[in-house]
Each structure stands twice: as structure tokens, then as C-alpha cells.
A protein has these predicted regions:
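Acidic catalytic loop of the alpha/beta-hydrolase fold
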Residues: 73-77, 106-107
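C-terminal catalytic histidine-bearing segment of alpha/beta-hydrolase fold enzymes
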Residues: 95-153
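A general structural signal for well-ordered alpha-helical segments in protein cores
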Residues: 22-25, 82, 144
């Protein structure tokens, strides 16, 4: 839809997604197949605390520069799995970077969410459904600087 709008600057379309939206962004930047190869492409992508597990199992690679921001203490999405996914794509992928915020949990960029234990999550790294979630001021500040810099490239 966006690519068909007359006001769109086609060379500047980027993807940005958080959590499940970040997973969707990572799926969307995989190599194109079939008729999709003829469509306009994205300039870049940013995925913030995405779960990389299923993508890692697919021999993921990106066709556009992709930035992943994730907390080192995230219990919903494993930073180690995202790093493994990106490392596995080296040599067959566009530039992909994972930036891990040590000690940061899921929702680290929320403007004002005290760190708290939440339960009932469908996905958690340990399978318990319990995760910590909340703002990490240093990670938030860095992400607010890092994302626009990435998108300007």
C-alpha cells in the first residue's frame, strides 16, 4: 500500500517493529522469491526485541541492512539466539547488526514502565510464561539515538 502512494519517497521506505512486529520485520527482509522480486524494496529494517528462534532455524539472511536491538536480560526474546542468527548469515546477507543492552529486559525502551515481573506470557525463554519487563533508561536513550542514525544511512 505505502509503495503505491504518490507522496511516498520510495527509496526511503524502511521497516520498524517491536517484539512480534520485530519478528515480522525480520521475516519481511528475507530474500525475495517469485513475483515479490519485482516489487520495490525496503531501504533498511529495525527490529526491537524480536524473538529470533524460528528465524534462526530457517538459515535467515537479510536483503537490506538490518539492525536488531535487544536486552541482554530479555526473557521473551533471547539475545544469544538473535546473535547466532545474524552470525550464521555472514557472507550471504546484507549488513545485519545486533546490539545487546546488558541488563536490559523486554520493553526496555518504554518511556516510563517500572521493572516488574509479569506472568501468563505465551512465549518466554525458559517456558515458564514469566518475564521481567520495564524501562532501562540507558538502553532507551541509546536506542532513541541509534534508530534514527540507522534510518538516515
Amino acid at each position: 500500500w505505502l509503495a503505491e502512494q504518490p507522496w511516498t519517497v520510495h527509496e526511503r521506505i524502511a521497516l520498524l517493529g517491536w517484539s512480534s512486529g520485530g519478528i515480522s520485520a525480520l521475516w519481511a527482509v528475507r530474500p525475495k522469491t517469485g513475483n515479490a522480486a519485482e516489487l520495490n524494496d525496503f531501504r533498511s529494517a529495525v527490529a526491537i526485541y524480536p524473538g529470533c528462534g524460528r528465524l534462526n532455524a530457517t538459515a535467515w539472511s537479510a536483503r537490506v541492512p538490518t539492525l536488531i536491538l535487544i536486552g541482554g536480560a530479555d526473557e521473551v526474546a533471547s539475545a544469544a539466539v538473535c546473535q547466532q542468527m545474524v552470525n550464521g548469515a555472514r557472507g550471504r546477507s546484507a549488513r545485519a547488526v545486533v546490539h545487546v543492552y546488558a541488563g536490559a529486559h523486554h520493553d526496555f525502551d518504554h518511556p516510563n514502565r517500572p521493572l516488574q515481573l509479569r506472568s501468563g506470557y505465551a512465549f518466554s525463554v525458559d517456558g515458564s510464561g514469566r518475564i521481567h519487563s520495564g524501562t532501562n533508561p540507558a538502553a532507551r536513550a541509546d536506542a532513541l539515538k541509534r534508530v534514527p542514525e540507522w534510518l538516515k544511512r
